[in-house]
Amino acid sequence: MPYLLLCIGCVFLGLGVLGLFVPSLQSLDLLTVQTLSHHRLDYLNSITTFLARVGGMPFVCFLSFLVCMYLAWYKKYITVIFISLGVIGSITMGWLLKWCVNRPRPPEAYHIVESYGASFPSAHSVYASTLACLAMIMLCHKHNINSPYNVLISCLWFVCMGLSRIYAGVHFPTDVLAGWGIGFIWIALLWLWLLQTQSRLSRKQIYF
């Protein structure tokens, strides 16, 4: 499973990177943002604004802190480290890439929410895919089954977050794809590390 996640992440990131260099993809990026800006609805605007708030770094860090405190109370320290590395690592990589690539955002005329930093990759998409992957791993292992509901809700979360950033006019589609890819790749690599750790420690110490 971590290898599948790693492959999907590489595909997403690869498509996102192509958007930086292929003129036809850049034109499609801008056309998508322009088209969505002409078909906005009030209730979708409200949902987009809400997702922009709950999907940002402050809320993600706060939520991760609460989960880690809960796990630390039950002495599940490996899981605390796993989640902490997942969140901190994805945040760091996302913002480092923003600084290095420094891709301009879509024109401000299309924005309906505030935005910070460069466009590539979408930080909200990085956070959303990271949390979705962590949730799928933790919940599936907690119940010892691959619950389709867990997977569905997790997928809906990161997909809706990514689409909302395009709808809001603050990111191009390839920014979102790259953000998803970064989250998937980072968590897949950490998952492989966790599986190696699992061979030395009991399952009870690692998962919820």
Residue ranges and their predicted role:
Residues 1-59, 99-112:
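N-terminal transmembrane-helix/juxtamembrane module of multi-pass inner/ER membrane proteins
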Residues 4-5, 111-208:
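Membrane-embedded catalytic cores of phosphoryl/pyrophosphoryl-handling enzymes
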Residues 7-11, 83, 87-91, 180, ...:
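Alpha-helical transmembrane spans of integral membrane proteins, capturing the lipid-embedded, hydrophobic core
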Residues 13-17, 88-93, 156-166:
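Aromatic-anchored segments of alpha-helical transmembrane domains
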Residues 21-24, 74-75, 101-102, 168-172:
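Short helix-capping/hinge motifs at transmembrane helix termini and TM-loop junctions
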Residues 31, 73-141, 145:
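Membrane-interface loops
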Residues 34, 82-87, 153, 176-180:
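Alpha-helical transmembrane segments of multi-pass membrane proteins, especially transporters
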Residues 59-65, 128-132:
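Core segments of transmembrane alpha-helices
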